[in-house]
Amino acid sequence: MRATHWVNVVALTLMVGSGLRIFNAYPMFARKGETFCCWPWEGTEVPAWLTFGGWLAGARHWHFAAMWVLAVNGAIYLAFIWLHGEWRDLVPRRGDPRDAWEMVKFYLFVRKRHPHQGKHNALQKSVYFALPWLGVLAVLTGIAIWKPVQLAWLTNLMGGYVWARYWHFWAMLLLVALTVGHIFMVFTVDPYSIPSIITGKYRPELSPEARNARPLVHLLPPRHEPPAEA
């Protein structure tokens, strides 16, 4: 399963860069001569340094190739967590909204101690649970705007070609935001988990809960004071 993380990073990077290059070929959601209600930057291109693929046709080739890699890799990941029962750690539970709020309070220094957590805290669970669904939405909306005539039922289900393209763009933005946020939190809250991505071994005594760690706070391992003399 650890390998799927690295494949996801590469595939998502290729898809985002090539997708933005495709978007720049027509940086609007409305049809020509029409207006669109929900995007204030209509007609504004994405900076070229964020794009990938060189030209429209090249970007499309990269985009479709990376799409299949991401889809197959996602299917492997979902099959793995299902077969090994790890999906139970990700499915939201009744108390998760309350626990997520406690984590927010802790990160904002309103709460002093790190809330107790299992394998993941409630905020992590919400992100990990949302990512596969966003991936599915990105794939379905992408297929809808790729084959709007052959798969008209799917395109219409998304609200038509314009809205399918809009939802596809937002799925990409949210995937990027959650991925960047995840990477930021790993490096600033739980850097000791990074070796486990390769080795699979994790030291609970260095967990964020054990260190009472917030972003960029308490990064060092906890100090164990010697017992006081009698």
Which functions belong to the PLM regions below?
Residues M1-A230:
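Membrane-embedded alpha-helical bundles that constitute the cytochrome b-like, heme-associated redox core
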